[in-house]
């Protein structure tokens, strides 16, 4: 058994979808003993918003790639895990020459995990949420200020909330920062 990290190509912007598809296939095929981790490495960066406001956001380090820790099997005969990864919707193939993927070096893996904050760093605290799905909220800032709507989705990791507001007589989903809404 040789457990290594491998990089696979995905469609840019479809990394999360490819990861979700792969995780479903791992469970469906019972390969938790062959495929151990699937990562989309990200790093925290500060972006400057309107009005000079700074916001910390997570950006993908390697758009178009997933990193998978797995046991690929023998040189001559890759195992079922190899086929499951290659056949996953959204994954276009392993990084490597010919038929055999090339594993990442320990230094590459350590660097990716360190920059992502997964090795030797604490996870950033998550934002506190003052409302739940289905709650009525009022928008207090931005282009939709003074609109009211219903919370349909909450993303604490990104500090975002999706609210259905009525614009020109139509229900429209709007993604807002937590700081832009208050409970009605």
Curated annotation (Swiss-Prot):
PROSITE patterns: NUSG. It comes from the Bacteria. Residues 133-163 form the KOW domain. Gene3D superfamilies: 2.30.30.30, NusG, N-terminal domain. Pfam families: KOW, NusG. GO terms for biological process: DNA-templated transcription termination; regulation of DNA-templated transcription elongation; transcription antitermination; transcription elongation-coupled chromatin remodeling. GO terms for cellular component: cytosol. InterPro entries: KOW, NGN, NGN-like_dom, NGN_dom_sf, NusG-like, Rib_uL2_dom2, Transcrpt_antiterm_NusG, Transcrpt_antiterm_NusG_bac_CS. Keywords: Transcription, Transcription antitermination, Transcription regulation, Transcription termination. Participates in transcription elongation, termination and antitermination. PANTHER family: RHO-INTERACTING TRANSCRIPTION TERMINATION FACTOR NUSG, TRANSCRIPTION TERMINATION_ANTITERMINATION PROTEIN NUSG. Belongs to the NusG family. This is Transcription termination/antitermination protein NusG. It comes from Thermus thermophilus (strain ATCC 27634 / DSM 579 / HB8). The gene is nusG.
């Amino acid at each position: 058994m040789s457990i290594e990290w491998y990089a696979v190509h995905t469609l840019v912007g479809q990394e999360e979808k490819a990861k979700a598809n792969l995780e479903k296939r791992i469970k469906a095929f019972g390969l938790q003993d062959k495929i151990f981790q699937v990562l989309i490495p990200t790093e925290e960066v500060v972006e400057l918003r309107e009005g000079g406001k700074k916001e910390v956001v997570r950006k993908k380090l390697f758009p178009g790639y997933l990193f998978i820790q797995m046991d690929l099997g023998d040189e001559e005969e890759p195992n079922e895990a190899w086929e499951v990864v290659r056949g996953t919707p959204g994954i276009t193939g392993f990084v490597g020459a010919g038929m055999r993927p090339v594993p990442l070096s320990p230094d590459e893996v350590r660097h990716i995990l360190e920059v992502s904050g997964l090795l030797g760093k604490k996870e950033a605290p998550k934002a506190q949420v003052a409302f739940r799905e289905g709650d009525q909220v009022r928008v207090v800032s931005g282009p939709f200020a003074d609109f009211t709507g219903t919370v349909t989705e909450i993303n604490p990791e990104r500090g975002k909330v999706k609210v259905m507001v009525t614009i020109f007589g139509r229900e429209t989903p709007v993604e807002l920062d937590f700081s832009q809404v208050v409970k009605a």
